[in-house]
């Protein structure tokens, strides 16, 4: 990374632990022994997280720079029977490699599908990474069939193993000039279909979507320009489309009050003789006093929506937790299905910091209770991942717990006073405020965006692709 201290001092997105690191690693670095540091029933696997880490600060205008545009860097913490290991790598985007054919940053979210690991953002197709090194293999276009961008939050259906996503861009769809499309990739990595989505207003900012077992849900928020302070004055629309639809003729649009939300927690459906409903949980703000250059989104609240598919109307839209949070996550095995717990990262107004997270939360859908975990004083973090406990680990009779909440929450944190990054592990069922483990990392890890847990069994399914996007001409070693 090429540094410029003057630029860093002028941008809030380059200060404190948002400042980029100057080194990446060529090999997995030893962190600690697994024994006595990691719970015995935590499955083997790797915690990966991407985030912005600008490569050349001399090219940045500090007045306009926002962390959404920072070059993606992926950090990995690998846990096996013997050791905990750490590695970081830049995503080899066009901005870094100076290849104009490679768009985007790969700095927003991670997804695993069909033996491939992807770094994603809204502005491009996903970057495929070589799992054992985290090096960039290619920008995936699914055999040339994907013409539009790939959203930051694709959904993997646990039943069909299909990958569902939405994105911007024109596409070769007859009789359509839509700028937004919904696509599905099957369990074998083949693009099955692309469906145009014609929004009724200017194309909104689209960051996430939802799926149930039979439907895909698209949000049409009244937010189009994030260059300055933004007000929400129009209605929100939810588009609900059967997952087996080949065009948008079966789309149902349901109206709700004006609001905005970046992230979906989960959605599911209920069908009986009297009702046919979609239920969805999102983090929303209703009066968006949001300024893009400050990322002051402390007003986010978890809302529970119910939509009646027969009447095509909203049944209810209720705030279910009064805790300000972001980055909602669930047990990923329950995407599209009813889930009991929604975990989140608690936002604080105590410090002046973009996305200031000072704890974790758990909302219980059955009881309506929200439990909070406070990070230690002066410690801030990011998105957590839920990892179920593994019973009979190391035996032929091993497996993952299916009990709601029986597992661990893993989150990367940063202790300001020590300038030290750490992996915190909490008990997801008890939600004890005391972490089970705190693992000191061998390098500072800047704050970032979304994370992913990959099981060791899935790691073994990664393809052995040796052709990589060329490395940086100037690289620092960890």
Language model features: what each stretch is:
Residues 1-478:
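Beta-propeller domains
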């Amino acid at each position: 990374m090429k540094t410029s201290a003057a630029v860093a001092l002028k941008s809030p997105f380059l200060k404190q632990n948002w400042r980029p690191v100057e080194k990446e690693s060529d090999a997995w670095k030893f962190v600690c022994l697994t024994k006595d540091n990691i719970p015995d029933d935590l499955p083997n696997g790797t915690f990966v997280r991407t985030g912005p880490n600008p490569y050349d600060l001399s090219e940045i205008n500090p007045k306009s720079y926002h962390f959404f545009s920072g070059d993606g860097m992926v950090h990995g913490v690998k846990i096996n029977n013997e050791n905990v290991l750490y590695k970081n790598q830049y995503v080899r985007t066009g901005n870094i490699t100076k290849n104009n054919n490679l768009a985007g940053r790969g700095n927003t979210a991670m997804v695993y599908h069909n033996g491939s690991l992807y770094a994603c953002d809204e502005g491009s197709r996903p970057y495929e990474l070589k799992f054992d090194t985290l090096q960039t293999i290619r920008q995936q276009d699914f055999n040339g069939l994907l013409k539009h961008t790939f959203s930051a939050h694709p959904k993997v259906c646990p039943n069909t193993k299909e990958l569902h996503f939405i994105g911007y861009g024109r596409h070769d769809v007859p009789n359509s000039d839509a700028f937004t499309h919904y696509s599905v990739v099957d369990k074998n990595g083949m693009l099955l279909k692309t469906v145009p989505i014609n929004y009724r207003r200017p194309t909104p900012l689209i960051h996430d979507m939802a799926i149930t077992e039979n439907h895909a849900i698209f949000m049409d928020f009244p937010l189009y320009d994030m260059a300055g302070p933004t007000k929400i004055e129009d209605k929100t629309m939810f588009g609900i489309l059967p997952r087996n639809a080949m065009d948008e003729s079966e789309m149902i649009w349901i109206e709700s009050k004006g609001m905005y939300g970046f992230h979906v927690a989960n959605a599911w459906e209920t069908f009986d003789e009297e009702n046919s409903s979609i239920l969805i949980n999102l983090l929303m703000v209703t009066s968006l006093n949001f300024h893009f250059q400050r990322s002051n989104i402390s007003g986010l609240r978890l809302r529970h929506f119910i939509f009646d598919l027969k009447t095509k109307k909203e049944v209810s839209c209720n705030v279910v937790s009064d805790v300000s949070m972001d980055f909602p996550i669930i047990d990923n095995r329950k995407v599209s299905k009813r889930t009991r717990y929604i975990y989140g990262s608690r936002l604080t107004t105590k410090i002046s910091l973009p996305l200031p997270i000072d704890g974790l939360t758990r909302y219980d859908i059955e009881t309506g209770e929200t439990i909070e975990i406070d990070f230690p004083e002066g410690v801030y973090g990011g998105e957590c991942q839920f990892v179920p406990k593994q019973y009979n680990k190391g035996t032929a009779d091993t497996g993952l717990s299916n009990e709601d909440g029986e597992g661990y929450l893993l989150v990367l944190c940063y202790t300001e006073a020590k300038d030290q990054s750490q992996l915190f592990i909490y008990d997801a069922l008890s939600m004890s405020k005391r972490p089970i483990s705190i693992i000191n990392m061998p390098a500072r890890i800047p704050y970032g965006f979304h994370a992913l847990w990959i099981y060791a069994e899935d790691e073994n399914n990664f393809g052995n692709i040796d052709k990589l996007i060329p490395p940086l001409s100037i690289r620092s070693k960890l």
